Amino acid sequence: FSSRLRLMLYATKEILFCKEKYQVLYAPSFRGIEPVIFLRALGLYRKPIVIWHHTAVVNSSGFAREQISRLFYKGIDKMFLFSRKLIQDSLKTRKAPAHKLKLVHWGPDLPFYDHLLAEMPDRKPEGFISTGKENRDVSTLFQAFAATKEKLDLYIAVSCGNINYKNIIDGFTLPDSIHVHYTDGVIPYELAKLVARKSCIVICCLDFPYTVGLTTLVEAFALGIPVICSRNPNFEIDIDKEGIGITVEYGDVQ
């Protein structure tokens, strides 16, 4: 749904008028089920609600918005988060007690990647690759690699959320060593094979308060490929300490 309001209306109708028996309402995020969460907070919806919360819970600006937000989180029975830091930051707001917050580690489908690598016995990893679509910092990425002769392949969506990557990329005059590929229509399996043929994965992200780039990071684990990654304090794993790559500060082009 392009409209969030249309999504909420559709999801709320489907949930409230669902004829199938169920015990728990589970959702990958609260997006679209906000009205049902408020109904739960008011005692008008009886099923427990369990969601993934991709960011830390934060305080809202203004007294009225803060009170509405507190009521909203009262309607969520359990939230899964990707790191302890996200949980710790959420607890500081006092909107969600500890018993509602659960750490769940995000990881790769190892049999999938084992099968993929088994199909590529003669692969000879070479060059750098950057993938993903959420809040990627393509400007820093290009500036950093343009100053080197290293080969980089960027696979990215034309746009994601409020960011139009194509507009940003079109503003650069790129050297022959940097190649951009738009991923619209590219299936994950084919993209994973392209990643597996590279010697290093670059995860260059904007500074957002959640685990930006985590899926790309766990894919690197599964493929055994080192990473150069923005230093995201929300990751559960210390990339430098574990020796799986190096991290750099946000916006660092050196």
What residue spans do the PLM features occupy?
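Short N-terminal targeting/anchoring amphipathic segment
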Residues: 11-32, 50-51
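Active-site proximal beta-strand in glycosyltransferases
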Residues: 24-26, 41-59, 106
